[in-house]
């Protein structure tokens, strides 16, 4: 059986509705939210989205639940805040 949604991917379910640019944006978001991410605790590629902003590691012996972004585990704001906190800690230690 051939792949019928080569160009549109997961947004093939919308057909011709809603416009191409909106479907392109939705495709990017849906691919991010349905993919697996690396667990920061066990290092395995087993973190999946359970609800908006809630991520769970299904690794053997890990089963940690994380709070993150709605579509990805980490957001740009969280990464920025984490690096700022790390930099401030280094300044205090020195």
From Swiss-Prot:
Source species of the chain: Schizosaccharomyces pombe (strain 972 / ATCC 24843) (Fission yeast)
Record keyword Ribosomal protein present: yes
Transmembrane segments: none
Gene: rpl4302
Subunit description: Component of the large ribosomal subunit (LSU). Mature yeast ribosomes consist of a small (40S) and a large (60S) subunit. The 40S small subunit contains 1 molecule of ribosomal RNA (18S rRNA) and at least 33 different proteins. The large 60S subunit contains 3 rRNA molecules (25S, 5.8S and 5S rRNA) and at least 46 different proteins.
Protein localization: Cytoplasm
Keywords: Cytoplasm, Metal-binding, Ribonucleoprotein, Ribosomal protein, Zinc, Zinc-finger
ZnF locations on chain (C4-type): 39-62
Protein name per Swiss-Prot or TrEMBL: Large ribosomal subunit protein eL43B
Disulfide bonds: none
């Amino acid at each position: 059986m051939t792949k019928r949604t080569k160009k549109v991917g997961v947004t093939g379910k919308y057909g011709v509705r809603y416009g191409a640019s909106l479907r392109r944006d939705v495709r990017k978001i849906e691919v991010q939210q349905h993919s697996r991410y690396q667990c920061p605790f066990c290092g395995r590629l087993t973190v999946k989205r359970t609800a908006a902003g809630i991520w769970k590691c299904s690794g053997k012996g890990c089963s940690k639940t994380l709070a993150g972004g709605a579509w990805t585990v980490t957001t740009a704001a969280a990464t920025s805040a984490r690096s700022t906190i790390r930099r401030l800690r280094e300044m205090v230690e020195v």
